[in-house]
Regions:
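Active-site acid/base region of carbohydrate-active enzymes
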Residues: 1-53, 70-116, 123, 173, ...
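Repeat-solenoid scaffold signature
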Residues: 139-185
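Well-ordered alpha-helical scaffold segments within catalytic/enzyme domains
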Residues: 1, 55-74, 112-123, 153-161, ...
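Alpha-helical repeat scaffolds
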Residues: 124-136
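Non-catalytic C-terminal accessory modules of carbohydrate-active enzymes
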Residues: 81-82, 165-251
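Carbohydrate-binding/catalytic loop surfaces
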Residues: 20-50, 97-119, 149, 153-159, ...
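Amphipathic alpha-helical segments of tetratricopeptide repeats
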Residues: 65, 92-93, 134-137, 176
């Protein structure tokens, strides 16, 4: 019930089927998209915030359908599936620019999130993916350029689409922004911001961890056998890496 109530709250602030700005608190505006992005990316741009949040809503509906299945509430499955599909179509219709082959502001998360949740039609996927590669190379100089929301989204997409070389090419960059930039500047834990502002022990960018054991290590969970009772071993090889060592501790 609580998850359904939260979805009801989100729907309360939806207009024409799309989630829009909801009320701020005295502390701050909590209708955020990506957060703690590198300098030069406007995380306050409404177009980016809306495509990110509505893509997240698709994830919520898809997850609720899975939960309903696990709980044996078969009557709830199809309504959530339909809501997810309806929102997928709205996202593409509203935020996609067919001339630019791009979504919203064209940042990495704006391009990847719709692809990840299934909002991008199959026939458009190659074009959007090529836009992503071009934007990463030209606008972002080959760097992973996202915040705490974008990093796990990009990571999940890279794992599912076996884009190990693309991800590795970004991770090995030593200049700002990047993980090696942190290490080269004395970091022993991940920072709150890519440039080192504020906290130097934060969980903002830890979503990258998934890539190491699911892509390089290739240990993928089986949703039909939860709790790692059954796994798939499908390592994604990167040409310039000579070895990877990984182990899974299950309980």
């Amino acid at each position: 019930p609580y998850m359904q109530q939260w979805l009801g709250y989100a729907q309360k602030y939806s207009k024409d089927g799309l989630l829009r700005q909801w009320p701020s608190t005295e502390y701050r505006n909590w209708y955020l998209g990506d957060w703690a992005t590198p300098v030069g990316i406007d995380q306050t741009n409404p177009a980016s915030i809306d495509v990110v949040n509505n893509s997240f809503m698709v994830t919520c509906y898809q997850t609720m359908a899975k939960i309903a299945k696990v709980l044996g509430k078969d009557q709830d499955i199809q309504p959530f599936v339909e809501k997810a599909e309806e929102l997928e179509q709205l996202i593409h219709k509203t935020f996609y620019d067919p001339k630019q082959k791009s979504y919203s502001t064209g940042t990495q998360i704006d391009l990847i999130y719709p692809m990840l949740v299934g909002a991008t039609p199959k026939e458009e996927l190659p074009d959007v993916q090529n836009t992503l590669f071009a934007v990463t190379a030209d606008r972002f100089k080959g760097h992973l350029s996202a915040g705490l929301v974008g990093v796990p989204v990009i990571t999940e997409w890279a794992v599912k689409n076996r884009q190990a070389d693309f991800m590795y090419s970004m991770l090995k960059k030593r200049e700002y922004p990047g993980y090696l930039y942190m290490l080269d500047n004395g970091a022993t834990t991940t920072w709150e911001h890519w440039n080192g502002e504020r906290s130097h022990i934060h969980n903002c960018y830890n979503g990258i961890g998934l890539w190491f054991y699911q892509a390089l290590g290739g240990i993928l969970p089986d949703e039909n056998e939860p709790g790692y009772k059954h796994v798939f071993i499908q390592p994604q090889l990167v040409e310039s890496l000579t070895w990877v060592k990984i182990r899974l501790m299950d309980f």
